[in-house]
């Protein structure tokens, strides 16, 4: 059984006298920097000139270029998008990593797939809140927190574990619980969840359901409501109470349909396909394809994205959402606590 660490399990004053540089001031960077600062940690922000630079200044941070921040800090947390990290690391962080410093990530992709190869004389660890930045920030302000993962890749100083847990505590994670993992496990499970279930699998399921109804002659508007719009109602129940709690809250008719029809849709063949997706993640096939795609300016990515954006479900959805101002109000509220990604 995994061990869960809470505030009382974590050494005090581990980060005292140390400067933490948060590199990037998007959704996660914004939350990490503010939470750490309010936890008494000496925080600086490293970000390029632009909206995020200005926002970080307005939020009261000491803001520098990435290179300047990396030079000043003992602990460097990289919170840039995966596809930007390697380039920024090579140009602005690598040469500032003197012996004994700590290089930190919130996702293991670039280290696990060797896009970033840290020097042998620095600590390398991961602290990953299991929620978006606006939630990390909001729960912290409420006196709570979002559960987090931590992992150690290199422990040169003998203090990497203590620093990782102290960082997790500083952003509020230890109020909810911090779980230990590895860079390999965090990276591979995160990618699998995104591809097979949360994003890829779910998007394909919703679209297939919509197409099945419209191709059978049903109105696209009704297909949208039944296959996409009402999804939030079910996911919220699952999020709060798990699968059993969701089933308790729906009608018996819906629950019986769940039991007898769900396995017909997601059958053994689908599970075998999931295993193939996982295999491509584990052996590096997916990572190689994504890295190359970015190196050639994303031709497939952009073409697929443009096509998907014009699918009938999007056309119908845009019209129907105009009928539901409460949907947009929720989006605007979330945007208030987030800032533009770098």
Swiss-Prot record:
UniProt cross-references to PANTHER family, sorted A to Z: KETOL-ACID REDUCTOISOMERASE, MITOCHONDRIAL
Cofactor requirements of the protein: Mg(2+)
Full protein name: Ketol-acid reductoisomerase (NADP(+))
Matches recorded under PROSITE patterns: KARI_C, KARI_N
Keyword list, A-Z: Amino-acid biosynthesis, Branched-chain amino acid biosynthesis, Magnesium, Metal-binding, NADP, Oxidoreductase
Protein residues bound to Mg(2+) 2: 190, 226, 230
Family to which this protein belongs: Belongs to the ketol-acid reductoisomerase family.
Residues holding substrate: 251
InterPro entries, per database record: 6-PGluconate_DH-like_C_sf, KARI, KARI_C, KARI_N, KARI_prok, NAD(P)-bd_dom_sf
GO cellular component annotations of the record: cytosol
Listed pathway(s): Amino-acid biosynthesis; L-isoleucine biosynthesis; L-isoleucine from 2-oxobutanoate: step 2/4; Amino-acid biosynthesis; L-valine biosynthesis; L-valine from pyruvate: step 2/4
Function: Involved in the biosynthesis of branched-chain amino acids (BCAA). Catalyzes an alkyl-migration followed by a ketol-acid reduction of (S)-2-acetolactate (S2AL) to yield (R)-2,3-dihydroxy-isovalerate. In the isomerase reaction, S2AL is rearranged via a Mg-dependent methyl migration to produce 3-hydroxy-3-methyl-2-ketobutyrate (HMKB). In the reductase reaction, this 2-ketoacid undergoes a metal-dependent reduction by NADPH to yield (R)-2,3-dihydroxy-isovalerate.
Recorded GO MF terms: ketol-acid reductoisomerase activity; magnesium ion binding; NADP binding
Catalytic activities: (2R)-2,3-dihydroxy-3-methylbutanoate + NADP(+) = (2S)-2-acetolactate + NADPH + H(+); (2R,3R)-2,3-dihydroxy-3-methylpentanoate + NADP(+) = (S)-2-ethyl-2-hydroxy-3-oxobutanoate + NADPH + H(+)
GO biological process annotation, one example: isoleucine biosynthetic process
EC number annotated for this UniProt entry: 1.1.1.86
Binding of Mg(2+) 1, residues: 190, 194
Catalytic residue list: 107
Annotated NADP(+) binding sites: 25-28, 48, 52, 82-85, 133
Segments traversing the membrane: none
Location of the KARI C-terminal knotted domain: 182-327
Cofactor note: Binds 2 magnesium ions per subunit.
